[in-house]
Amino acid sequence: MNHTKLIGIIDSLLDTDAYKLHMQQAIYHQYPHVEAVAEFHCRSKEDLRPYAKAIQAQIQHISTLSFAQEELDYLASLSFFKKDYLTYLKDFSLNSEQVTVDGSGDQLSIKIKGKWIDIILWEVPLLAIICEIRSSICYPHSTADDAIAQLKTKIERFYLNAKTVDSATQTATDLSQFDLIDFGSRRRFSKDVHHKVVDYLAANVPEFKGTSNYHLARTRNLTPFGTQAHEWFQAHQQLTGELADSQQLALNRWLQEYPDSLGIALTDCINTDAFLRDFNSELSERFVGLRHDSGDPITWGEKAIKHYESLDIDLRTKSLIFSDSLTLDKALNIYKHFASRINVSFGIGTQLTCDLPGVETLNVVLKLTQCEGRPVAKISDEPGKIMCRDEDYLTQLRQAFKIAN
């Protein structure tokens, strides 16, 4: 496949992760005039500069898209979207002039600058087009059939491992509480692979419960999943009086927007220890669960359980969502460890939608680097995931949250 044939990779603004719209609605109601900057980073250290022109063409195409009435009607059917926000979406489109693509340096540079509400929906389609352009050039003979064949093998192994009798309990694994969710929009091999993988899972895997992608949820009648991303917490670093108060402000503002829904909190914008210190009794009661996105999942889960137990909260009323570089095998091991104690779900992305024979996956991100003209940062529970353009600010952030350098 030649990249000149790829005009129109993204053909719906709903082809995005659900949490982007959830955050945009909260921004619409609470921070409509806040300015932000987001920047692209390729963790794989692969040279993507040759794709700059093709990426720019796709950006121009995306800027021509708007929400169709049937898409707005679908969003209106979800109880947490409000009428004023949906009215705003009727006239919404992404502005290509806010995106700067530069392939002249030593690596591909992409910067998005504008009002936070205007730029927040760029991330998922932008990363998806980068991955698909690269796939079409580097792996022109790989197809969705290859992805499905690989997926079938993994699913067979998953069920075989689940049936294996555990030496300690002398029983096989009961999968009745195993919830699998597609988190594969951003770094998928291609749109075609993503769609066919989700279709296969929906038809053949009872444990498959839904997708983070609103377009697929709408067109396949699947349950959508998603709450908020790191950028919600990052932005609040510059939307609060005291830096140390930013996490609690972000959590409380989320509850202000969604008091009775979307109650999963992401723990690792700073790190989990710092998060749990801020996650007081009221917040722990009101949020229905936590999401893991970096660091050791077992260690993280045990910390979460210990936190809930210290507050005398019934673990069966809470959920842990695992979403960090998961495979089906990793998810099964985590499930075996926690399922008898607390509700667990598993969001799997790249290992579902970009796992093809001979294909090396691309690890790319687009993260907020400024809010209101000042730096923001993500530290996380994993050193390789730190994202900040200002070392002095990073030091300040660590000090505010009592984190060792």
UniProtKB/Swiss-Prot annotation:
The modification Phosphohistidine is found at H230. GO terms for cellular component: cytosol. Its EC number is 6.3.4.21. One of its GO terms (biological process) is NAD biosynthetic process via the salvage pathway. GO terms for molecular function: nicotinate phosphoribosyltransferase activity. It comes from the Bacteria. Transiently phosphorylated on a His residue during the reaction cycle. Phosphorylation strongly increases the affinity for substrates and increases the rate of nicotinate D-ribonucleotide production. Dephosphorylation regenerates the low-affinity form of the enzyme, leading to product release. Keywords: Ligase, Phosphoprotein, Pyridine nucleotide biosynthesis. Pfam families: NAPRTase, NAPRTase_N. Catalyzes the synthesis of beta-nicotinate D-ribonucleotide from nicotinate and 5-phospho-D-ribose 1-phosphate at the expense of ATP. This is Nicotinate phosphoribosyltransferase. It comes from Photobacterium profundum (strain SS9).
